């Protein structure tokens, strides 16, 4: 088992947004170990809302087997939903290594990560 985190996304943009997850490397998914990163793939977040509610969706890095020496990582893309489709707003690459999560945001996407405690928290905000 690897280091886990509770993650949520807050939409402070005037328009609704849609999220896409890709580039998943060494992260449990689809309920493995309780981690469900796929929850965010295709998720629509209404303006001025946070998804999911509560403490967030649990995600967990894989820290065994082939992944023991590899950085766990994924990319979260954020698109604004427009009348003509979608417009990219930015993205954030989230990575975990040695029980610490890190972020690399672009565009209108920010992330605040707290690595203290048994589980990290990852709060992504779109402006």
Model-derived features: positions:
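Intrinsically disordered, low-complexity segments enriched in small/polar residues
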Residues: 1-127
């Amino acid at each position: 088992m690897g280091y886990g985190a509770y993650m949520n996304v807050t939409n402070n943009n005037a328009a609704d947004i849609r999220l896409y997850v890709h580039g998943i490397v060494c992260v449990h998914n689809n309920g493995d170990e309780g981690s469900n990163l796929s929850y965010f793939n295709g998720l629509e977040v209404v303006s001025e809302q946070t998804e999911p509610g509560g403490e967030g969706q649990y995600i967990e890095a894989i820290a065994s087997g082939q992944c023991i020496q590899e950085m766990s990582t994924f990319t979260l893309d954020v698109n604004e939903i427009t009348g003509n489709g979608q417009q990219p707003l930015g993205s954030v690459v989230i990575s975990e290594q040695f029980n610490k999560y890190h972020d690399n945001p672009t565009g209108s996407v920010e992330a605040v990560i707290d690595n203290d405690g048994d589980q990290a928290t990852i709060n992504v905000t779109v402006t």
